[in-house]
């Protein structure tokens, strides 16, 4: 057994990272999605500014639950 060595086959295909091609329509959808996420984050910020104490209480665990 001491004379046998294991060799791993080289996988150059997996080592190369390819940049995905994004069509213009997908880019527009990504921008729309970003705008939706930004709007949601703005809404969360407003809730936290106006009622942060109650918001935090909603996440407090009681009795090990």
From Swiss-Prot:
Residue ranges for the region (ARC ATPase binding) are 21-59
What the entry says about post-translational processing? Is modified by deamidation of its C-terminal glutamine to glutamate by the deamidase Dop, a prerequisite to the subsequent pupylation process.
| GO terms, biological process | modification-dependent protein catabolic process; proteasomal protein catabolic process; protein pupylation
Report if keyword Coiled coil is assigned.
yes
Residue ranges, compositional bias (Basic and acidic residues): 1-14
This chain's function reads:
Protein modifier that is covalently attached to lysine residues of substrate proteins, thereby targeting them for proteasomal degradation. The tagging system is termed pupylation.
Q: What is the name of the protein in this document? A: Prokaryotic ubiquitin-like protein Pup
- Organism, as annotated: Kineococcus radiotolerans (strain ATCC BAA-149 / DSM 14245 / SRS30216)
Instruction: Give the gene symbol.
Output: pup
């Amino acid at each position: 057994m001491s004379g046998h060595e294991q060799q791993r086959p080289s996988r150059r295909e997996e080592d190369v990272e390819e940049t995905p091609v994004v069509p213009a329509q997908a880019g527009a959808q990504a921008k729309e999605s970003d705008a939706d996420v930004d709007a949601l984050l703005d809404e969360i910020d407003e809730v936290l500014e106006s009622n942060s104490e109650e918001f935090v209480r909603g996440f407090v665990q009681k009795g090990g639950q």
